[in-house]
């Protein structure tokens, strides 16, 4: 009886023994692909990005001084999904992509300041107080950063609503989390952060208040320039750095369309000639002229279109539209790296992993697992064994 039981146990052991190596192989393949697609691919992509070189010596009469360089990252249109239109697979996939990309960029590139150019959230324009708190907590987890790294945010139309949806409650709710500062100065560099949604120009309360704040910032910047030239019209007070500011906003300055935009992350060719609507796709011509006149910026960075574009306003003021940071809006998201001094700057673009490449790798993994399983159970000849059999047949001829 004992011999029969032992023999029965041996017979059952062989199938288990046969299945165990297959299971281990399948687990190993899945683990390796997950590790690469969800972690290592971000290091592989961002490791290829380097801070652009910028001239760091400024001539002051006969003396040359070395200027400090600020390393700044610019990204836009993260569009964290909300409870109404968002569904959990989309949230999980796209938010994990942005979190891994951002955390990898922080670790590899070590920026000093990060600017996000609006549309942080997808449903801030209508989210309930409870949903808003949940969205903010997710944002703070995804875009967590060391205390020595500054994170600055400007409002977009999806954060506080388009002009006709915007109200004081939504603006104050946003500014309570992300600050209401309009001017940020560091290392002798001035950044003006504009609530471009409130530049409709129709005299609404929020619009008037926003314009008054921007005029005050413009006055302070101009006073610093004049006092540096020996003028005393502005009276006593702390001086701002006298360098021309960098303008940061969500809406681009006025342009007719993306017809003159080019590059792999520009708008698709069939969309480039579509005319833009003022105060919807871009700022109005009037608001754009005001900003250029008030601040005389040396550089403008904006978001909103989800695509890249470089234009020059008046033939001298460059504006760069920053593509979306999320796979939800682009197959090839990216961000801008800037090496900036008080008198000069250089920008470069860092591309994140392409979503279609990741999907192709996963599809390839599924196909490989199917072939491996069929081969293991003898339902499909192993390519290696098939090759050996072919060689044997040739030798016997």
From Swiss-Prot:
Ligand binding (a divalent metal cation 1): 119, 157, 250, 304
Enzyme Commission number(s): 3.1.-.-
Cofactor note (record): Binds 2 manganese ions per subunit.
Compartments, as annotated in UniProt: Endoplasmic reticulum-Golgi intermediate compartment membrane
Binding site for a divalent metal cation 2: 77, 119, 250, 306
GO molecular function, one term: manganese ion binding
Coiled-coil positions: none
Keywords tagged on the record: ER-Golgi transport, GPI-anchor biosynthesis, Hydrolase, Manganese, Membrane, Metal-binding, Transmembrane, Transmembrane helix, Transport
TM ranges: 27-47, 357-377
Any GO BP: GPI anchor biosynthetic process
Membrane protein topology class: Multi-pass membrane protein
Cofactor: Mn(2+)
Domain of life (superkingdom): Eukaryota
Segments carrying motif Di-lysine motif: 393-397
Family recorded in the similarity comment: Belongs to the metallophosphoesterase superfamily. MPPE1 family.
Subunit (UniProt): Interacts with GPI-anchor proteins (via the GPI portion). Interacts with TMED10.
Family matches, as PANTHER family: METALLO PHOSPHOESTERASE RELATED, METALLOPHOSPHOESTERASE 1
Function, as annotated: Metallophosphoesterase that catalyzes the removal of a side-chain ethanolamine-phosphate (EtNP) from the second mannose of the GPI-anchor protein intermediate. Participates in the glycan remodeling steps of GPI-anchor maturation to allow an efficient transport of GPI-anchor proteins from the endoplasmic reticulum to the Golgi.
Domain notes: The di-lysine motif (KxKxx) acts as an endoplasmic reticulum retrieval signal.
Protein name according to UniProt: Metallophosphoesterase 1
Species annotation: Pongo abelii (Sumatran orangutan)
């Amino acid at each position: 009886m004992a011999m029969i039981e032992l023999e029965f146990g041996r017979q059952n052991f062989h199938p288990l023994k046969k299945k165990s190596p297959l299971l281990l192989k399948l687990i190993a393949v899945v683990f390796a692909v997950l590790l690469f697609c969800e972690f290592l691919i971000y290091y592989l992509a961002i490791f290829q990005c380097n801070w652009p070189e910028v001239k760091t010596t400024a001539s002051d009469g006969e003396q040359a001084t070395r200027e400090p360089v600020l390393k700044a990252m610019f990204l836009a249109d993260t569009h964290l999904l909300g409870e109404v239109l968002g569904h959990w697979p989309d949230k999980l996939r796209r938010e994990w992509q942005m979190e891994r990309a951002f955390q990898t960029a922080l670790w590899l590139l070590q920026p000093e300041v990060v600017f996000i150019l609006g549309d942080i959230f997808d449903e801030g324009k209508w989210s309930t107080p409870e949903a808003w708190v949940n969205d903010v907590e997710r944002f703070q987890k995804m875009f967590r950063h060391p205390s020595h790294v500054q994170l600055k945010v400007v409002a977009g139309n999806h954060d506080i609503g388009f002009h006709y949806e915007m109200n004081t409650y939504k603006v104050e709710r946003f500014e309570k989390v992300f600050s209401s500062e309009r001017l940020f100065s560091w290392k002798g560099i001035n950044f003006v952060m504009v609530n471009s949604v409130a530049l409709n120009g129709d005299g609404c309360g929020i619009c008037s208040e926003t314009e008054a704040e921007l005029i005050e910032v413009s006055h302070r910047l101009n006073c610093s320039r004049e006092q540096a030239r020996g003028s005393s019209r502005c009276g006593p007070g702390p001086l701002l750095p006298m360098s021309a500011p960098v303008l940061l906003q969500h809406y681009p300055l006025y342009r007719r369309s993306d017809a003159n935009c080019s590059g792999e992350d520009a708008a698709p060719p069939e969309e480039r000639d579509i005319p833009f609507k003022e105060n919807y796709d871009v700022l109005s011509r009037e608001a754009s002229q005001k900003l250029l006149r008030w601040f005389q910026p040396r550089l403008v960075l904006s978001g909103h279109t989800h695509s890249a574009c470089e234009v020059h306003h008046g033939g001298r003021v460059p504006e760069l539209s920053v593509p979306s940071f999320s796979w939800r809006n682009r197959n090839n998201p990216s961000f801008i790296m800037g090496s900036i001094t008080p008198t000069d700057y250089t920008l470069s673009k860092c591309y994140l992993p392409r979503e279609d490449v990741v999907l192709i790798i996963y599809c390839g993994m599924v196909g490989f697992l199917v072939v491996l399983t069929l081969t293991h159970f003898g339902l499909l000849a192993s390519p290696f064994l098939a090759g050996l059999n072919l060689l044997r047949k040739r030798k016997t001829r």
